[in-house]
Each structure stands twice: as structure tokens, then as C-alpha cells.
Amino acid sequence: MSSWLGGLGSGLGQSLGQVGGSLASLTGQISNFTKDMLMEGTEEVEAELPDSRTKEIEAIHAILRSENERLKKLCTDLEEKHEASEIQIKQQSTSYRNQLQQKEVEISHLKARQIALQDQLLKLQSAAQSVPSGAGVPATTASSSFAYGISHHPSAFHDDDMDFGDIISSQQEINRLSNEVSRLESEVGHWRHIAQTSKAQGTDNSDQSEICKLQNIIKELKQNRSQEIDDHQHEMSVLQNAHQQKLTEISRRHREELSDYEERIEELENLLQQGGSGVIETDLSKIYEMQKTIQVLQIEKVESTKKMEQLEDKIKDINKKLSSAENDRDILRREQEQLNVEKRQIMEECENLKLECSKLQPSAVKQSDTMTEKERILAQSASVEEVFRLQQALSDAENEIMRLSSLNQDNSLAEDNLKLKMRIEVLEKEKSLLSQEKEELQMSLLKLNNEYEVIKSTATRDISLDSELHDLRLNLEAKEQELNQSISEKETLIAEIEELDRQNQEATKHMILIKDQLSKQQNEGDSIISKLKQDLNDEKKRVHQLEDDKMDITKELDVQKEKLIQSEVALNDLHLTKQKLEDKVENLVDQLNKSQESNVSIQKENLELKEHIRQNEEELSRIRNELMQSLNQDSNSNFKDTLLKEREAEVRNLKQNLSELEQLNENLKKVAFDVKMENEKLVLACEDVRHQLEECLAGNNQLSLEKNTIVETLKMEKGEIEAELCWAKKRLLEEANKYEKTIEELSNARNLNTSALQLEHEHLIKLNQKKDMEIAELKKNIEQMDTDHKETKDVLSSSLEEQKQLTQLINKKEIFIEKLKERSSKLQEELDKYSQALRKNEILRQTIEEKDRSLGSMKEENNHLQEELERLREEQSRTAPVADPKTLDSVTELASEVSQLNTIKEHLEEEIKHHQKIIEDQNQSKMQLLQSLQEQKKEMDEFRYQHEQMNATHTQLFLEKDEEIKSLQKTIEQIKTQLHEERQDIQTDNSDIFQETKVQSLNIENGSEKHDLSKAETERLVKGIKERELEIKLLNEKNISLTKQIDQLSKDEVGKLTQIIQQKDLEIQALHARISSTSHTQDVVYLQQQLQAYAMEREKVFAVLNEKTRENSHLKTEYHKMMDIVAAKEAALIKLQDENKKLSTRFESSGQDMFRETIQNLSRIIREKDIEIDALSQKCQTLLAVLQTSSTGNEAGGVNSNQFEELLQERDKLKQQVKKMEEWKQQVMTTVQNMQHESAQLQEELHQLQAQVLVDSDNNSKLQVDYTGLIQSYEQNETKLKNFGQELAQVQHSIGQLCNTKDLLLGKLDIISPQLSSASLLTPQSAECLRASKSEVLSESSELLQQELEELRKSLQEKDATIRTLQENNHRLSDSIAATSELERKEHEQTDSEIKQLKEKQDVLQKLLKEKDLLIKAKSDQLLSSNENFTNKVNENELLRQAVTNLKERILILEMDIGKLKGENEKIVETYRGKETEYQALQETNMKFSMMLREKEFECHSMKEKALAFEQLLKEKEQGKTGELNQLLNAVKSMQEKTVVFQQERDQVMLALKQKQMENTALQNEVQRLRDKEFRSNQELERLRNHLLESEDSYTREALAAEDREAKLRKKVTVLEEKLVSSSNAMENASHQASVQVESLQEQLNVVSKQRDETALQLSVSQEQVKQYALSLANLQMVLEHFQQEEKAMYSAELEKQKQLIAEWKKNAENLEGKVISLQECLDEANAALDSASRLTEQLDVKEEQIEELKRQNELRQEMLDDVQKKLMSLANSSEGKVDKVLMRNLFIGHFHTPKNQRHEVLRLMGSILGVRREEMEQLFHDDQGGVTRWMTGWLGGGSKSVPNTPLRPNQQSVVNSSFSELFVKFLETESHPSIPPPKLSVHDMKPLDSPGRRKRDTNAPESFKDTAESRSGRRTDVNPFLAPRSAAVPLINPAGLGPGGPGHLLLKPISDVLPTFTPLPALPDNSAGVVLKDLLKQ
């Protein structure tokens, strides 16, 4: 039934949605149409304002002919289409109407059911009122409110529905008429257009016949319009009256309800306050109240469902109205056909009316004005109605909310309340939306009526148009004013319509949404019901399984504990006899509560034990690792052997214990599969315990855990069973409610279908019996549960004892563990000490190694210095008389340094000796440790052999996991290596740069301070070296510590993670096994949840792993960076040392050349300053000249200015290019950095992806397992399905048989009851004639009908769905009847045939008798023969008698059968009578419809009469306008009278309805009686429940008493057991002593194992440290070897250099002896030069001041020049003889693209374009070859081939690392070789001599480049500001010095050949300062 109702609800929801959608679309169309009408009205009026209408009418005549023909064609086409559509529609509409009638019958049934439900609601409310005290008030209020709502609403809704039906019918009519209007308007527009076009033509001569025809058509159309308008006006007046009445009722009701609700709100608030204050006082009473409120809320839920049903009923009513509307439409169609006939007749008259058509137009204008006014009024009224409706909806919603809030005391019921509120709100919204739509439709109707009135008025005035024309012309002016007003009103109306449209659309959208939500909710409800059913089935299955399991458990427990059970069984038997039926349920409840409490405690204990086990396992794993490590390093073999023996003994004992425990486990394994899984884990644990004591501990814990789990499972099962019982009870109650509902429905439908009701009743009885059976079974289950519970109690008691023992054992073990921990802590402390000593050793060793290194280096330095000293001494001895004082100073300084170094060396040697002693001691201790480790290794190898056999199972699992981890690690390492390589590359680059920069900075510093090296400098260097050494040491230590930390972290983390993964894998395997074995859906779900949780955990673990790996990699990279930095610093140190040596050597030689260089440099600087001054002065002159020329001659200046502009532009372009290049460079840098970042990110992503891949693989494996499980379940389902299919086939077969029997029976019945059939035939005949009458009525436009048909189809489909379910039920019943009748008929036929056979036999026998009589007469003489014959005859007679008796018996049987058949026939007659009642109901409905039709016809007649009255009124108006008002008043009065009549008729209809309702109430009373019966049965149920509760209470009391007795008996038993114990004490004492010994041995073993573990730990730690030290040592050795090789190479190179230098010096010494005298002279000269230099510097200062002044002048001139340039620019634009810039640019670019041989031709071309003569060009080329100035090429940065004339330095590149002193020497040299000074650029353009940019850039230039530079630039290019390399991004045009405040424009400077540039070459790293110095020396 629930599914049927659900289907009905969903169908209704869909139909509602469709109806809403169609209504929305219709209203939208109407609103759009009204807008269009208004717009067109204005256009018409505006078009028809001019007075020249007569001319238009004349022009129209000609056009109307052609137009008339077109209209005729259109009419014919439309008629054909119309006929075709009518033929189609007739068939469809008949079928739909039949179906609608069926639906209406169903609706009546549903209404009856609704009334019954309402009665039930009232009852429930009365029950709710009996709630005591606090809850009483809200309950009563709620009930009262509900009753109120029920009393008021249905009637109102009914009225609404009636009106709604009328609206729908009128809406359809409106749509049709609106289409007609639009068509007519389009025609009017067409005519107007034609009239406008043909105004100019003016066709006066038109045929009179055409005009007449058109006039006829117009008249006919106007008549139609007037009729329709009258009809609609009447309908509208009726509707308005009804609406006004409704509005008043609604407003009154709304006010009343509001006041009620306000009062209720106040009451509820007071109650809430009271409830809040007295919470603490009345807890018990409140609980009771809460229960009551729960019941009330459930009742309210039922009520809400009823409300839903009511709404569904209303929807059905609306469907009814639709059908009535269709009838109206059919009538209208018929009318239309008649009108069409009339139209054809009137077509002839149309010609006469053509002239009058134009005269009617002003009247149309008037009517449009009146129409707009009416529309405005109606819109206002509609808006008022809308407001009222909305208020009502709101009030209803508020009422619902208030009612729910009154029952909101219990927080747990808040959710139900919310749901109810939501549903009610949704329903209210739907209601309000429907009302809005209705009102909108009414508005549209009114508007259309007005329009039709306009058309009607025009039609009626056709007769008196001539007379009105004159009056209308007079009134035109007045009307024009009114027109303006109407236009403004119309605009407002349009706005209102738009707003209404928008509101309507929103409402429709909302309605659709609500319907979707309702349908979704229904679907969800259905799904929930199905799920609950499935759950019930599953729970039942589980109960059976649990019962089986419990039986097994009880059997096993009986076997174990027979003695206790026997003693308890005797007691139980005594008590069970008294307490079987009464105490079971209560006892179960109490025990279950206890079990739940114990469950909770056991769960807690389990959790604690699990944690304990986990800790133990972690300890075990740690100890195992330590053992494995310590196996390689154990000592004390003798002591260990003894320990081993003890341990083996211990292990044997433990094995015995374990065997006993395993037996227990095997018994427990039978209990459940879950327990088996845990036992398997235990077995594994036990195996571990055989080898290690800690594992034994874990095993014991697991045993206790398993026992707890068994207990927990039993308790859980009990809890579940109890829950299932409760649930079953609830389900029974729910089902009882459902059945009650079904009974009510059946009772409603009884009058219609008595046979169906009887069958339903039987079905219900069967169901009740089934339920009783189920209840009995459940009672049995409860009994079984009782017994089970008692047994489980025994089990629990035994398990508790075992637990106690286990806890004692655990305590002992914990004591042992504590002792072991203490020992381990001591060992740990010792280990820490050793590790500290080792660290100290390591540090000392490192220091010693470093000292050794430093010593070696110092020795080598010493040797070198000694050699140098010897050499210097020799030189001094040779050149004693001419020795320098500086050389002597340096010698003394070196000697003092040597002495200091010797002292340092001695100190270092002493330290080394001390450290060596320490290292030897440590080595000895290490050797001892190693020996002990080796001994331990031997012992541990033996142990390992034993372990390997035992751990075979474990190792396999671990190996698999290890392989996975290894693969991961490999991938991680690969990635790390890649990362490391990339980072190393980056770091090496960075280090190179770092080194270079450092070296450069150091070189600069050294260069600057070379000329006064002293003691302080050497000391500073030594200190720096020491500091660097210290830094290196610190960094090394840091690196070592970091590497250690990293290794430790990685090892620990990997270990932990692997352990966690192993645990998780084990758990997953267990779960998989469980999934594969168990078929319980709940278990599967639980396991799936666990799986998900584990997957989450695993993901987290992987995430942690990834993070740790990242950290590792990060730390490693940092370590590598640190190493690189250290290496860089060391390299820098070595370079510094080398440079110091070189400087010391060089300083001695270069001392004498210094003076010369300084003098030369100073003189050169002075010359350069002079040159600059000259250049500036020339520039000033040129500027002045330019200014003069610009001011005087414009013509001459044109070309110059052009050139000037072009050059400036080119400069700007080049600047832009340079900027672009710089930007590009920056972009490239940024992209490189981005690429680096991206690479890092990608690597991280790679790691993440790998981790994800692993996770995915795991998930895949899990999914595969799940998939296999699902496949199995799927196969099972398939088998079930097949079985079901077979059953279905059987059922179908039986149904088919039944159908056959039914057919036969029906045939019989036709013969038996022809009267019935004739009666039944009458109804279909009447229906057919009705259909025929209706089919005649069908005549409307095909498009609208098709749309409506589609809607009807949809509604029919939905209704079909509901009817099908009912039909199926009917079919079943009819099938069963048919089957029985068939069987009876067959039997009857058989009996008939048998009777016939018997009759035939009788005839034969009679004939035989006659023959025998004749024989007797003939042979009477022969006595003998006659006697013999007689005897035979007697025998034959006896046989015949037997046959006759048989026949009689058969006849009796047949009579019985006939009686049965008669009874069945009577039943069938009864069913037919029921059907007759149904047919009568149908006939009544038909009668109603016919009544409706008659009413409609009457209305039509009234409308026609009205029309006539109006026509008379109009005629009277034409005669005289004075009597119009009176006539109108009379008409109004007549209308009112008619409305009164109609209302009376309506009241009569209502009375008839009330009679029907009375009949319904009679039916309801019957239903009420049935309900009373049900109520009594419910009371009986309640009584039985109370009785049960009482019996349970008594049972609990007796159970308690029984427990007390049990306790007493147990005490007696304990006394007996104590006696037994005393007898067995001797045995126990002996065993106790043995156990004590065993425990002592165990303690010893534990102590020994702890010691061993601790030593193993220490060993492992030390091993790790040793490994780390070895690694670091290896690294350091590698580094050392590398350094040594480098140093050797350096030393060899140095030696060779020194040898060469010595040879050179020897030669030089000989030369120098000769030159000493000349040098003294040179010295004198140098002194003189220095004096001159000082003078030159003074001069330089003066010159610089002059230069500054000139610069200022220059700037001023520059400003003037800029102004002049601007003027020139303006002149250049106007001046002639311009050079084509594009051509010049192309030539210029071409010049550089052409090969060097052909460049002269390009230049000649340029010259010819610029107007340079050939002679001048040749001269220029000649000058260019000869080295004359060529500023353009230099300026553009082209490679200059010519040598510039500026004095240059000997080597450009050597300046880089040179100090000021060096530069000074070079300057002196250059001064000694003077050259002609060329004109110079500005001082700002000069780069300073020692600018760092230049230095840096030139350091790395290769020698080859230097040579080329020298060859090109001669001596000195440094001064040139244009020689800045391109790599520095210096613009070629704007030199470094040129700023915004720089000197004048480049073009104004003298054209000089000082602008050569060099393409930058890549710097080579091997270019050191030494090479530069060598070059210097060579030059």
C-alpha cells in the first residue's frame, strides 16, 4: 500500500508541476498579448487622428477586392485544416474523457479515505489531551488548533477548486478568443497599411457588390463578438461575486486565527519559562511528559501526511474542473461551426459595409479609452486580492510554525518538527502560488471581456453609423484630450503588467522547485523503507546464525565445566519451573545492561592492553635489532653458555605452558571466526615468546585480550538481539498502523467492491496470523536467549578467573621489565661516557691531522725562506757597497719570522706527541672492545641459527616489505643523486665566482699595499690563516655532527615506518581474510570503514616519510654546500700564500723601477689634462660658430640641422637598443632562476608522485580484494535471482490457469444471469450516446486542442499509474474467482456425462427385464428352467440394486455440488450488484455532467438575452441619450436578479453536495466502528504489555532471590573445594617450589637478557659512530690527498720558476754590477723628476679648475644649442633638399652588412646622396687610410683598424690588478717615450685609472686577446671612454661619464680617431696576477 501511495503521490506531483507550467505559460502569453494590444491601441488612435478619413475609405475600395480574394483562400485553407484536426481530436478526447471519469471515481474513493483519516486524527487528539500537567496544555492547544484548521479549510478549498475549474475553462476560451482578436487586428493593420499606400491613388469607382460582401462579413463578425462578450461578462460577474465572498471569509478567518495564535504564543512562552525554572525538580515527570510529547509529535506527523493527501484530493478536483472546461469548449466549438455557416451567408452583405467600416473607427477609439480605465480598476482589485491571498498563506505558515513550537519542549524531536515545518511551508507556498495564478487569469479574463465589449459596441453601432458620424466629429477634439490621458494610464498599466509577469514567472519557478523537492523526498522515503526491509531480513538471518553459534559455544563450555554446570542446573531446574513465562524479558534486559557495562569496562581494558602490547612489540623490535647487531660483538662466552642452558630450560617450561594455552585457544577458536583470526596472531606471538621473554609477555596479554573479545562478542550479540527485538516490536506497531489504514480504505471502498474487501480482509487475517507466528518465534528466541545468557554468565565467571591469573602474571612481568629498564639505563650511561670519549678522540685526531698539515706547509715555507735568505745573502755579499736599506730591513724581518715559526713548530710537535699517546691508549681500548665483540659474534651466530628456523614465517613477510622499501629508497637515492649533482653544479659555479671575487679583492688589496710590506703585514696574514683554519675546523665538526644526525634520523624513522607498515599490512590481511569468510553485510561495512581509516593512516605515514626524505635531502645539500665553502676557503688561503711569496720576490726587484714609472705617469696625466683643455676650448669655438651660423644663415643650416637630427635620432635608437639588450639580459637571468626553481619544484613533485604511485598500488590491491568479494556476492545474488525467476514462472503459470477458469465461469454466469447483463449493457449504451453528443460538440482550433491533449495525456499517464495498481488487485481477485468457477464447471460436466451413461444402462436393463417377463410367461410350464432362471434373475436384481444405490449416492454428491454452485452464483450476483452500484454512481456523475451542461446552456441563453437587451439599449441611445442611464440601471437590476437566481441554483447544488456528505458521514460512522474495534484491540495489547512488564518485574525479583541462593550454594561449594585444596596442597607446594625455582631462573635470565640487550645497544651505537668516523676519515683523506697533489704540483712549478729566476738573477747580477753606477745617476734624475712631478700636479689642479669653468660654459652653450636645435627642427621641416631617411638608414645598415672590400662603394653612394663631391670623397678615403680622424666609425662602435694617436699604456689588460704605485711607474715609462697628443673628449668621459669595473673585466682576458688589443690600440686604450666592454651593457653612444648634467652633444666635439672599441672575449680563469706581472717585466 505504501508503495502504491508513493506512486500516487509522485504522479500527482508531476501532474501538478505540468499544470503549473502550463498555467505559467498561458498567463505569460496573456500578459504579452495585453501589452501588444495596448501598444497597438495607441498606434491606431494616433494614426486615425487626422480628419481625412473619407479619402481613406475611398482609397480602400480598390484594395479590398484583392484582399477579399486572399481572405477567401485563407478561410478555405483554415477550414480544411480545422476539419482534419477535429477528426483527430474527436477520437482522442473521447478516450481522455472516459479516463477522466475513471479518475474522478478514484478521487471520490480517496476523499472518503481522507474523511476517515480526519476522524482518526480527532481521536488521536482527544487521546493527546489526556497528557498530565505541563505537557497537557500544549497538547490541547495543538489539538484544538488542528480541529479548527480541519473544520474551516476543506470548505474553503472546495470553493476555491470550483472557481479554479471555472477559471481554467474561461482561460481556454480566452486563449481561443485572443487568437481570433490577434488575427482580426493583423487584418485591420493590413487594411490600414493598404489604405495609407492607396491614399494618393483615390479609387472612387469601386464595385458595390464587393462592398456589400465585406459589410456582411463585418456584421457577422460583430455579432459573434457581441455574443461572446455577453457570455464572458456574465461569467465575470459571477466570478467577482464569488471572489468577494471568499475574500471576506478569508480575512475574517485570518484575523481569528491570528488572535488565537497570539494567545497560544503567550501561553507557550509562559510554559517555557516555567519549564526552564523547574527542570531540576521534576525530572521523572518531565521524562513522562517527553514520552507523551513524542507520541503527540508522531500523531502530528500522521496529520501532516493526511494534509498531503488532502492536497492531492484537491488536485484531483482541479482535474475534474478541467474535464468540465473541455465540455464547455466542445459547446463553443459547435457554436463556432454555426458561426462559420453564418459567416458564409454574411460574406455577401460585407460589400455594403465597406463604406461604414471607416466611420466605425472613432467609436473604437472611445471604447479603447473606456477599456483602459476598466483595466486599471481591475488591476487594482486583482492586486488587493493578491495581497489578501499572500497574507493568508503567511498566516497559515505562521500557524503551522506556532503549533510546532508549542511541542518543541523535547530537543530530540527538533529535527522531526523542522521537517514538518518545511513540508507545511512548501504546501502553503504551492497554495499561494495557485491562488495568484488564478487571480492573474481572472484579470486577463476581465481585460479580454472589455476588448470584446469594444468590438461588440462597434458591431451594434453599425446600423446607426451615419447618424453618429456627425456627433463623433464634434466629440473628436474632446476625445483627443482623453486619448492623452488614456496613453499615460496605459503606460502605467504596462508597467504593472510587467511586474505581474515577473512575479508570475518567479512564482512558477518556485512552484516547480518545490515539486521537485517533494518528489525527491518521496523517492528518499521509498529508498529508506526498502533499506529498512533489507536490514530486517539481514538482522533475522544474523539472529539465526548467532543462535547456532551460541549453541556451539554452550556445548563446548559444557564439556569444559561439567561439574559447575551440573550443580547449577539442579538449582536452575527448581527455579525455571516457576519463572519460565514471566521473568525472561526483564532478566534479559537487566543482564544485557550489566553486560553492556562490563563491555565498556572490558573495551577500556582491551584498549589499555592493546597499547601495552604495542609498546611491548616496539620494545621487542628494538631489542631484536640490537640483538642482531650485538650478535657480531658479544663477549663473556662462559657466562653466556650457562645463561643459555638456563634459558633453554626456561624456554622448555614456557613451551609446556604455551602448549596448554594453545589447547585453550583451539577450544576458543570454535566460538567465532573473528576469534580464530586473533588466535592465529597469538600463535605467531607464542612462537616469538619461545625465543624471547618479552614475546612471551605479549602472548599472555593477547590471550587475555582474546578472552575479553569473546566475552565482548557475546555481549554485543546479546545487545544486538535485544535491539532487534525492540525494533521488531516497533515494526509490528508500524505495520499494525499501516494495516489499520488499509482497513479504513477498504471500508470506504466496500460499497463499491464488496468481494475485493472480503479478499483483503482474508489477506489481513493471514498477515496477522503470520505476525502472531513471528511473535511466537520471537518469544521462543527470547527463551533460548535466556538459557544462552545463563551459560554465558558461567563462561564469564570462568574467564574472569583466568583474567585474574593473567593479570597476576602481567604484574610479575612488569616488575621484571622495570628491573631490566634500570639495568638498561645504567648501561646507557656507560655507553654515553664511552661515546663522549670517542668524540674527544676524534676531535684530537682531527686537530693532530690539521697540525701535521700546517707543520708540513710551514716546513716547506721555512725551506723556501731559508733558500731565499741564502740567495739574498749572496747577493748582499756581492753588492754590499751598493745595497738598499730596504733589502736589509726585509732580511731582518724574515729572520725574525723564521725564529717565531720555529717556536710555533716546537709547540705543535709537543702537542702532536701528546695526542699520539692519547690515540694509542684509545686504540688499545678499541682493540679490547673488538675482541669482546668478536667473541659475542660467535655466540650470537649460534643463536641466530636457532632463530632463523623459528622466524622463517616472519622473514618472508618482512622480506617482501623490505624489498618494497628498498625499491622506494633506491628511487629516492636516485632522485637525491640527481638533485645533488644539479646542486653541486650550481654550487661549483657559485664557488668559482666566490673564489674569483675573493682573489680579485685580495689582489687589489695586495697591489695597493705592496710598496710598503712589513712585519705587521706578515703577522696579519698569519693571523688570518689561523682564523681561517679555526673556521675550517668548526665547519668540519658541524658537518660531521650534521651527517651523524641525518643518518640517525633516517635510520630511526625508516625503522619506525617499516614497523608501522608491517603492522598495518598484518591488520589488512586479517581484514581481507574476514571479508572473504564472513557473509554478514554489517561486518563487511565495518571492515570497509576500518580499511578506509587504515588507508588514511597509511597516507599520513607516507606523507611523513616524504617530509623526512625531503629534510634528509635538504640537510645533505646543506652539508655539501658547507664542504664547498670550506674547499673554497682553503683554495683562497693557498692562493693568498702563493701571492704573498710572489709579492715578496717581486717587491725586491720592482723597487727601483717605481720612481721612473711614477714620474712618467704624472707627466702623462698632465699632458692628458692639457689635451682635454684644448679639446674643450675647440668645442667652445665650434659651438659659438654653430650658434652664429644658425642665427645668420637658415639656408645653409638646413642640411646641417638635418644631419644633426638624424644623428640624434640614431643615438636615441642606439640607446633604446642598449636598454632593450639590458632588459633582455635581465629576462634571461630571471628565466634561468625560474628554471632552477621549477626544477626543484619538479623534483619535489616527482617525490610526491612516487609516493602517490605507491599509495595507488596499495589501493589497487585492496580494491582487487574487495572486487573478488563483490563478485562472490554478485554470484550469490544471481543464484537467488534465478530461484526467484523460477518461482515467478510458477506463479505466472498458476495465474494463467486461474484466468482460464475465470473465462469459463464467466461464460456460465452469462447464461445464468441475462438480466444482469442487460442491465449492465444499459450503462455503456448511455455512455456511448453521451460520447456521440459530445463528439458533435467538438469544434475548436487544432493548435490549442493539441496542446491541451498533450497535457491531458500527461495527466492520464499519471492517473493510469495509480489505476494500474488497483486494476492489478482487482485482477488477482477476479482470477481467484475464475479459477474456482472453472474447476466447478469441469466437475459438473464430468458428473453430467456419468449420469447419461447410467441412464443408458438403465434403458438397456429395462429392455432385458421385459424380455425376461415374456420368457417367464412362455415357459411357465417348465418349472425347472424357470427356477433356474429365477435364481439367475435374483442374482441379477441384486447386482442392479447395488448399481442403483451407487447411482443414488452419486446423485446426492451432485446435489451437494449444485448447492455449492448456487452459493457461488449468489456470491457472484452480489458482486454484480456491487458493480451495479458502481454503474449507478457513474450514471449519477453523468447526470451531474448533464446538469452542468444544461446550466451552461442556460447561461448561454441568458447571455444571448443580455446581448439583445444591450442592443435595445444601444438603439435607445441612438434615439435619445437621456434615457440611457435608466435603461442601464434596469439592466443592472435584471442582472442582479439573475445572479440571485444563479446563486439559488448554486445553493441547491450545495444542498445536494451536503446530502452526499451526509452519506459519506454514514460511511465514516461505519469506519469509526471499525476503528473502535481496533482501539479496543490496541487497549488489549497495552494491557498485555503491562502484564508482561509486571511479570518481568516479578521475574527479576525471583532471579535476585535465586542469585542469593546461588551465592549461598557457591559458598558451600567453596568450603568443599577448600577441603579438596588442602588435600592437594602437598602437590601444589611441590609444584610451587618448582615454579619458584623457575621464576628465579626466569629473573636471572631476564637480567642476563637485559644486560645483553644493553650491551648490544651500546655496540650498535658505537658501530654506527665508527662507520660515521670511517666515512668522515675517508672523506678527509681524499681531501688531503687532493691538497697534497695540488701542493706538490705547485711546489714543483715554483721550484722550476725559482731555478729559472736564480739563473736569470745570476745573469742580471753580473749586468747590474756594471749598471749600478748608471742607476745612481738615474736616481738623481728621478729625484729631479719627482720635483717636476710635484710641479706638474700643481699645474694639473689649475688645469682642472679651468676644465670645470669650461664645462660650465659648455653647459650654457649646450642649452643654447638645444634651443637652436628646436628652431632648426622647425626650419628643417619647412626647408627643401631633405635627405631620405629611409634610404640613408638602409645604406647605413648596408655599409655594415657589405664585405670590407666593397664598403667604399657604399660610402661613395652615401656621399653622392648627401651631395659630397667625388674629389672630397677620395680625399676622405685617403685620410681614412692614412689614420686621419674617423669619428663616425668609432662612435658607431665599428671595429677600428687604425691605431689611435692617444698615448696608451704598454698593456691595457695589465691595469686590472695593478696598484697605484705600479700605475705611477708605468706612467713614468710612458712619459719617457712621449707621443703627439691628439685632441681629447671631456674629463667626464674618462674612466678613472683604477675603476673597479675595468679591472674586473680585464682580469680574465686571455693573453691572445691582450696581444690583439696591443696591436690594435698601440699603447693605451684605457683613457678612451668608449672602450667600455659591451657585456657591461654600457651604451655605445652615451659613455659612462655622460649624465644629464654632462657636457654638450657628441656631435659638437672635435672629430677624432680616439673611438676604437673591442668585442668582448670570454675571460679565462688561469689568468693570474703573476702572468700580468711577467708581462710587465718583459715590457
Swiss-Prot record:
Residue ranges of the region described as Amphipathic lipid-packing sensor required for tethering of intra-Golgi vesicles: 2-38
List of residues that carry Phosphoserine: S464, S1842, S1891
Membrane topology: Peripheral membrane protein
Listed GO biological process terms: cartilage development; chondrocyte differentiation involved in endochondral bone morphogenesis; endoplasmic reticulum to Golgi vesicle-mediated transport; Golgi organization; Golgi ribbon formation; inner ear receptor cell stereocilium organization; protein glycosylation; protein transmembrane transport
Localization, UniProt: Golgi apparatus, cis-Golgi network membrane; Cytoplasm, Cytoskeleton; Endoplasmic reticulum-Golgi intermediate compartment membrane
Record-listed N-acetylserine modification sites: S2
Keywords per UniProt: Acetylation, Chromosomal rearrangement, Coiled coil, Cytoplasm, Cytoskeleton, Disease variant, Dwarfism, Golgi apparatus, Membrane, Phosphoprotein
The protein, known as: Thyroid receptor-interacting protein 11
Organism field: Homo sapiens (Human)
